[in-house]
């Protein structure tokens, strides 16, 4: 039963991705990072080291992917600030994992929630535009 549910979730995510705008994909990645961080924190608190490592590793992968998508040439100060925040988050997650410190994960969760909240406020008419089209 569990395998069937996982397969269904994967098909659902795959179908959402295939029809998603770049804006929506970033929203999904941020939501996925938050979810993995919460799961990793719970595993940390329960002493479940394998699950903690797997979930925090996935959160790191997502954050590193988001960071790699930044356009430093087009994004100006916003891209530079996000780059610094993503770097901070990667370091915090790594240290939280090493020190087994859930509070450090709470800090990262709060930061990414704030970034996602700002991202969610972007009006729909801008969801498919490139930096050149916006005039950045």
From Swiss-Prot:
List the subcellular locations.
Cytoplasm, Cytosol
| InterPro entries for the chain | FliS, FliS_sf
Q: List the disulfide bonds.
A: none
Main location (coarse class): cytoplasm
Is Chaperone included in the keywords of this UniProt record? yes
- A cellular component term, taken from the record's GO annotations: cytosol
> Tell me, which GO biological process terms does this entry list?
bacterial-type flagellum assembly; bacterial-type flagellum-dependent cell motility
Alphabetical keyword list: Bacterial flagellum biogenesis, Chaperone, Cytoplasm
**Which family does the UniProt entry place this protein in?**
Belongs to the FliS family.
Question: This chain belongs to which protein, by name?
Answer: Flagellar secretion chaperone FliS
Q: Which organism is it from?
A: Vibrio cholerae serotype O1 (strain ATCC 39315 / El Tor Inaba N16961)
């Amino acid at each position: 039963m569990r395998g069937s549910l996982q397969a269904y979730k994967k098909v659902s995510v795959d179908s959402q991705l295939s029809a998603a705008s770049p804006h929506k994909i970033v929203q999904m990645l941020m939501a996925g990072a938050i979810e993995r961080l919460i799961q990793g924190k719970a595993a940390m608190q329960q002493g479940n080291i394998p699950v903690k490592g797997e979930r925090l590793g996935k959160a790191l992968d997502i954050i590193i992917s988001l960071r790699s998508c930044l356009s430093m040439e087009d994004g100006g100060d916003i891209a530079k600030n996000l780059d610094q925040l993503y770097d901070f988050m990667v370091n915090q997650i790594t240290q939280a994992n090493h020190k087994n410190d859930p509070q450090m994960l709470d800090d990262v969760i709060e930061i990414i929630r704030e970034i996602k909240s700002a991202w969610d406020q972007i009006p729909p008419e801008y969801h498919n535009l490139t930096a050149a089209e916006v005039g950045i």
